[in-house]
């Protein structure tokens, strides 16, 4: 796409909405880290690092001091990104999505390297002492003496031997920003939090600028410690820039789906990237080819792909090695996974189709369900051969939703035609064992709510879970589907597999059945709406990583 004006805030808002499932309240954790920094960090050394960052020319010794300070801060923080390189294969992401991600990372790499003058971490050129002196003479020649600045201020230059040591040593952290404003500004932390909260509220509707900062400073004097200079590239988190303050303010807002509060975890990496690409294509976002500053999509993409675990925006990342394109790799060849070692004589035999790691992911997902909340359950297919399971908690929006390939394909086709509309070809790659793993992992004594409980109770008993109770709401078929169309209109993107044609069943004396496919998840949502009388204003959130739902089709061998 050719270069054009970027509607930055509109893109930011779109990304906030699209990634709202992965944003979290972080205010308490940020303040906790800020207190730890204040209690243990030597702020005399902090002042020296801030002085270094104001120098026009910085050397190897300056970089060493910055790295040492970053290491101390990292050790004090609980919110950090850890080194977790990711290899993405077809499965959770389609081949087209992998190709798109790979292309965007390559474009971003070229843009960053171009802006750095070919040397990673060194913006505006990595000039030697001789070149610096020569540049000074040339500036005098063209009328730009030492007292004459151009553009947005001084060009800061690093004159270091190994510029790769600069990677990931910059960028602000809200906990550090709050600590510096409190300790060095002589303010109470409560005043700082209040001031930054005001800045964060402005950020929910626009990018705060220096004029906004000046006006807010009248009500919150603590904000006067924020520099009035324009933000610069390669500036450390110890400098109290406006962008650092805005980031900290975003963390003080428990709401607004702020991108700054995203937390990455390996199981959810593909899900988050998939959501990002969907928003990108809907809003026609792109990676530009010119300029130093990153647009919102570029900024998000870089931060997410730098590490698959931790806080990409607000955590300490100074101990991470490599750049985003180094740490997130795309494997389009799909090499077969290594076969497990044979079971030794007398050793335990694992009959589960899931690996230990996959079972752990299911257990982690199920543990996020609250035993105290209303929990709906529904299946498609008979209890002995289910093809779909959904468990939904309407108060939080959390749900578990998975599929299973049927054993009895003939019976499945009849069920598809008259009920669920699932197609056999769409279930061939469904990962086996998920339904059993979910039921086994449910909390002891959990109460499940269902519309029609016979098949659910059979399924539960088949897994030996006599401790689980199933409550049947016993709605009539017609009453149960009062909210069917509104639910499908609103939540249709959650259901992508029920694409087959459904035919009405003809029963004497009964109203004609619906020709909408029966989706276990949609049914749970509409049954809850029928019981409560309204569709809840909560966004459903899948707890199972999408990588786990289906087998890697590139690893399948056709014999």
From Swiss-Prot:
GO molecular function: hydrolase activity; metal ion binding; RNA binding
GO (cellular component) term, any one: viral nucleocapsid
Entry-linked Pfam families: Arena_ncap_C (PF17290), Arena_nucleocap (PF00843)
InterPro entries linked: Nucleocapsid_arenaviridae, Nucleocapsid_C_arenaviridae, Nucleocapsid_C_sf, Nucleocapsid_N_arenaviridae
EC identifiers of the protein: 3.1.13.-
UniProt keyword annotation of Metal-binding present: yes
Residue(s) at site: Important for exonuclease activity: 455
Coiled-coil positions: none
Segments of this protein annotated with the region Binding site for the cap structure m7GTP: 53-235
Binding positions (Mn(2+)): 378, 380, 523
Domain topic, free-text comment: The N-terminal region is important for the cap-binding activity while the C-terminal region contains the 3'-5' exoribonuclease activity. A CCHE zinc binding site is present in the C-terminal region and may thus contribute to the substrate binding and/or the specificity of the exonuclease activity.
Family: Belongs to the arenaviridae nucleocapsid protein family.
Function (record text): Encapsidates the genome, protecting it from nucleases. The encapsidated genomic RNA is termed the nucleocapsid (NC). Serves as template for viral transcription and replication. The increased presence of protein N in host cell does not seem to trigger the switch from transcription to replication as observed in other negative strain RNA viruses.
Designated name of the protein: Nucleoprotein
